[in-house]
Amino acid sequence: MSDSLRIIFAGTPDFAARHLDALLTSGHNVVGVFTQPDRPAGRGKKLMPSPVKVLAEEKGLPVFQPVSLRPQENQHLVADLHADVMVVVAYGLILPKAVLDMPRLGCINVHGSLLPRWRGAAPIQRSLWAGDAETGVTIMQMDVGLDTGDMLYKLACPITAEDTSGSLYNKLAELGPQGLITTLKQLADGTATPEAQNEALVTHAEKLSKEEARIDWSLSAAQLERCIRAFNPWPMSWLEIDGQPVKVWQASVIEDATQSLPGTILAATKQGIQVATGKGILNLLSLQPAGKKAMSAQDLLNSRREWFIPGNRLA
């Protein structure tokens, strides 16, 4: 293609690999790939390459895996590729200003939210957690701040009542490459129009933790149901019964008012396990005891009915 760019790609997980795959079929010239060092994984703690490294090596691309881009000798790895632009997608390393300034057109990032909403580490999960009606991807020019650069292109998608972080991740992994290819075309032909982020509209997507995912029955049923979807597939909402963690995969909201204390089991039937919350009733539909597969409430009651006696309270 006449407006082909020399591109350095930097990314690590599957989400990033999908963007690299799109670049490789776009007609641009990917001159090098940066990804995180191989990490121990699995029971044997065997060193495993990132999905981006696997794809890059399949395609015969040069792969670089520095632990940091702060040392000058590692920055030379970038400079020596003489790229027009560096595309960064879930890379996991900070790019110093010297690196940001190296490519002719700078560095651009694909971020999984409609900036300036949800800057930070967990934008997909936080959009669900907060009950947002939509989310999307933003392609932005990178600067030294955390997701603070000028916006180049946005694509939105609705959040449905059935979406989990897993399903939303897949939606954005389809949208992101579309936005990226469009943005690169605009950069190549000089039609990109950077837009500053409105600082008054900024929200921050804090990292998730396993402790945050513990169900707090004082919250409303609607909030808890959103948390269950937001924390799926990681870290998974959970409750504790008899000292054992039990993951919750699916629940529904019953708007009925209840005078019972939050955490009180109101009913346990094949239709679900109904628990009082700070507002409304949460109906648990699919659960996973430690060491077991996820199962319906009915199947769990068949083996552990003593866990869910109406009138008892869950911690």
Swiss-Prot record:
It comes from the Bacteria. The gene is fmt. Pfam families: Formyl_trans_C (PF02911), Formyl_trans_N (PF00551). Residues 2-189 are annotated as: N-terminal domain. It catalyses: L-methionyl-tRNA(fMet) + (6R)-10-formyltetrahydrofolate = N-formyl-L-methionyl-tRNA(fMet) + (6S)-5,6,7,8-tetrahydrofolate + H(+). Its EC number is 2.1.2.9. PROSITE patterns: GART (PS00373). Residues 210-315 are annotated as: C-terminal domain. One of its GO terms (biological process) is conversion of methionyl-tRNA to N-formyl-methionyl-tRNA. It comes from Salmonella typhimurium (strain LT2 / SGSC1412 / ATCC 700720). Belongs to the Fmt family. Composed of an N- and a C-terminal domain. The N-terminal domain carries the tetrahydrofolate (THF)-binding site and the C-terminal domain is presumably involved in positioning the Met-tRNA substrate for the formylation reaction. One of its GO terms (molecular function) is methionyl-tRNA formyltransferase activity. The keyword Protein biosynthesis applies. This is Methionyl-tRNA formyltransferase.
